[in-house]
């Protein structure tokens, strides 16, 4: 219907990416933990396809929208029941740290991010908070994929839009679901910096 109505390839790809992002935003924590990978794959595929359609729209790539839509449709059971997204009033991004520090902060992380943006908060500050979590934790490749895709897709919508808020709230939920980690990465970075300076890591007795 959208194609017949004259939607552009970019618009089709952006709509698909939004639908895939909402699978993360509405992912209920009662699902198996491994199912986060299912919604992650659908979203990152849709983001990659959208970026390709922006650069080089073609009939073959538009066909990929159909494949992606089928994937999003097949993942619908992961949103039954759908997680409720309640905006946290007077949201403070510093409160996200508590969501990274303890298990069970998935819904609160989404509410903080959503509340921050819907109340006029600066999108770039939320993105910075998500980036800080990537650096502070032992982030996996999927984490970087989800955050990168969320930032790109949120930027595809007007600043202050509902769509952008929902997308970034989903990214916050995804990170909260996978934290805390052992947080060995900062130690590795500090060790690498010391080695680069030529410091002695161990002293012989």
Range-by-range predicted roles:
Residues 1-205:
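Mature, well-folded catalytic/scaffold domains that follow N-terminal targeting or propeptide regions
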